[in-house]
Amino acid sequence: MNIFELRLKILGAIGRYKAKRRLKKLGYCGKGCKLGEPTLLSDYSKVLLYDGAEIDNGLTLISYTGRFIMKKNSSTAVGLTVVTGNHGREIGKWFNISAAEHSEDIEKDVVVEEDVWLGTNVTLLSGVKVGRGATVGAGAVVRTNVPPYSIVTGNPAKVVGFSLKPEEVIEHEKALYPEEERLPLDK
């Protein structure tokens, strides 16, 4: 082994060690999760990743009390931004976003359900729930809930289609989920 190969091997080992340390800081980390770097997290404990969840490089989480929850087998491309709060305004007071003022923020969890794909540079805003099997296109700003198996794009994100027909959703759910975990499709 030459010096170049040795250096690559050492750098790889350091990278794997750092990745494991980052995952241990999370509020919850299931099996087979990945969290790229760099990440900008106000609080690692506010991130919950379930089995097989993968976040590519460049996650930014802006949160004081809200959590970011990513469920099983969901993935992101680079540059995901998650904002769990909104700044309030009070009559008769100057607008101030200093750290001391964040106690007045309205914070809500952001939830990404199972089997979701989030494209490059997606922004998820406070209280949003991205439904199971949804696809969020690159650059989308999601400020309202996303229906299961829908495709959303734009700013603000809007439904532009569905990835599966209803009969395909039934087949897909049967293949992947136990009966008690399947979406109710009669609504």
What are these regions (language model features)?
Residues 1-32, 73, 80, 85-95, ...:
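Terminal amphipathic alpha-helical/low-complexity segments used for targeting or macromolecular assembly
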Residues 40-49, 54-128, 155, 162-164, ...:
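Flexible, glycine/small-residue-enriched loop-and-beta-strand segment within the central core
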Residues 18-52:
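Short linear elements at protein peripheries
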